[in-house]
Amino acid sequence: MLSILWNLAAFIIALGVLITVHEFGHFWVARRCGVRVERFSIGFGKALWRRTDRYGTEYVIALIPLGGYVKMLDERAEPVAPELRRHAFNNKTVGQRAAIIAAGPVANFIFAIFAYWLVFIIGVPGVRPVIGEITPNSIAAQAQIAPGTELKAVDGIETPDWDAVRLQLVSKIGDQQTTVSVAPFGSDQRQDKTLDLRHWAFEPDKQDPVSSLGIRPRGPQIEPVLSEVQANSAASKAGLQAGDRIVKVDGQPLTQWMKFVTFVRDNPGKPLALEIERQGSALSLTLTPDTKSVNGKAEGFAGVVPKIIPLPEEYKTIRQYGPFSAILEATDKTWQLMKLTVNMLGKLITGDVKLNNLSGPISIAQGAGMSAEFGVIYYLMFLALISVNLGIINLFPLPVLDGGHLLFLAIEKLKGGPVSERVQDFSYRIGSILLVLLMGLALFNDFSRL
């Protein structure tokens, strides 16, 4: 319950910030173009708070935080007094109206740059993309990528950390040939490997894209050595102590901690014969895991904590820049995200990416909560990502979106007169239906992932 409330709070804050940024873009440019703004609303429905400024603009925070709008004076919506007609939106030039409409998405892109600027000034911790293990028969295994190598570049784009690797690889989903440059850790002797990503599919909210390719990043090592044994646990009753190294389980040699975890989890209430090493001496013990119910299924539980060897410092990176350099890096990062978003949307349309990859508000809320838990840097990065997506999607040429309005203005400029109201009304209905269908599909995908 607490996690749901946390996700919801993080989602509402994110939505409020991004909607305010988007609508402020429309508002600011409208004011600069001499258009009278009657209302600036964050949310829909009943007003929870309202205030009117000296220019007559009413500012509103409404009950339903799923959008917002800027209401401008417009003769097409209501009669306008003669002395105010020059302040009506419809009486401005095509260029001015286009600037007002485009200002919302542009504000989202500027916000993303600002968020990344803050991130790069604070410093982004990362891990060099060194491969720990390769899953047999995976896409990475078929490309003959070896453990212990470092992913230096994807299709010529340098990848200094795992986040850069993920960004570049996801943009290549559905491609037949993607070239990755690898080198032994600490070496610059690169080799090119080719990935076939035509059949690559993963669930973004459940799977790491790198892991779904069969690549396990080099991380902290977890040894089959106990660092802690909980009091009154199954392990304590079996006589296990901190410092014990587990050598065998039921006669099977043990070199990886996760193998021990699997043995314990799969054998609730069943005795397991352990061979351990304690201060240089070999001992035999019997461990009978306690039983716990996890999602309605009985699982074994021992009550131990393994010894973890931290990742060596040479594997760690931090991307941190001065104020000016951070602007350049933030702009480049935002541009990369914009290209990725357009690329992925294009592949959704062509079918190269399956529609079940489309995410809706539930997945976004989960992402908001998770990033907020990790800290301010990751929450800012999440806001930047969603802000870019919001800006790109709003530029889609659907009549109910900013892109649709820009399309009508382009037609007006070409033909020398506005598109007829009948055509606009029909287009708005079609656009609304398509948008509802798209939102319905995104929600369906969200619920199917729960």
Curated annotation (Swiss-Prot):
Main location (coarse class): membrane
Biological processes annotated in GO: proteolysis
Keywords tagged on the record: Cell inner membrane, Cell membrane, Hydrolase, Membrane, Metal-binding, Metalloprotease, Protease, Repeat, Transmembrane, Transmembrane helix, Zinc
Subcellular location: Cell inner membrane
A GO MF term: metal ion binding
Note: Regulated intramembrane proteolysis (RIP) occurs when an extracytoplasmic signal triggers a concerted proteolytic cascade to transmit information and elicit cellular responses. A membrane-spanning regulatory substrate protein is first cut extracytoplasmically (site-1 protease, S1P), then within the membrane itself (site-2 protease, S2P, this enzyme), while cytoplasmic proteases finish degrading the regulatory protein, liberating the effector protein.
Reported cofactor(s): Zn(2+)
Origin superkingdom: Bacteria
Membrane-topology descriptor: Multi-pass membrane protein
UniProt-listed InterPro entries: PDZ, PDZ_6, PDZ_sf, Pept_M50_Zn, Peptidase_M50
Protein's organism: Salmonella typhi
Record's subunit section: Interacts with RseA.
Bilayer-crossing regions: 98-120, 376-398, 426-445
Binding site for Zn(2+): 22, 26
Free-text domain note: The 2 circularly premutated PDZ domains act to negatively regulate protease action on intact RseA.
GO cellular component, one term: plasma membrane
Class of enzymatic activity (EC top level): hydrolase
UniProt-recorded name of the protein: Regulator of sigma E protease
Catalytic machinery residues: 23
EC number: 3.4.24.-
Domain PDZ stretches: 115-186, 199-291
